[in-house]
Design a protein with these regions (language model features):
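Short, solvent-exposed recognition patches
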Residues: 1-95
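Surface-exposed amphipathic alpha-helical segments
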Residues: 96-120
Length: 120
């Protein structure tokens, strides 16, 4: 597994909840509590020719971000179906053989600020 993203910005009431590492599948899931919801970071490394399992969700693209000193772009989507009371947001990017996803229910500006302030 390559580098784990460091969250240099964390909103108030954003706290670590749990993590799970699956060495066989080469993936990591980290969860944070935020205002009675869960924000998750999912990482999958395909470096050992493992089967691709990107979880690309449908939604409206609201931003494409470039992080300073990084070679990849981050796509941010808003996801809401008829049963949701509040929007969810998801950010995706790939760096070489590693797929990253951050998702959860959060205010749009806070979510984008969280993603913009990721470092490796």
């Amino acid at each position: 597994m390559k580098n784990f993203p460091i969250l240099c910005y964390r909103p108030k009431d954003f706290n670590f909840r749990d993590y799970e590492i699956n060495f066989d599948m080469q993936n990591v899931l980290v969860e944070y509590n935020y205002n009675d919801t869960i924000i998750s970071i999912y990482i999958n490394d395909y470096g050992d020719n493992s089967k691709i399992q990107d979880y690309i969700l449908d939604g409206k693209i609201i931003a494409e971000l470039e992080l300073e000193d990084e070679t990849f772009d981050i796509e941010v989507k808003c996801i809401k179906d008829k049963f949701d009371k509040k929007e969810s947001y998801v950010a995706y990017w790939k760096d070489g053989t590693v797929f990253y996803q951050i998702s959860g229910k959060m205010e749009e500006k806070e979510f984008i600020k969280l993603v913009k302030n990721i470092r490796f």
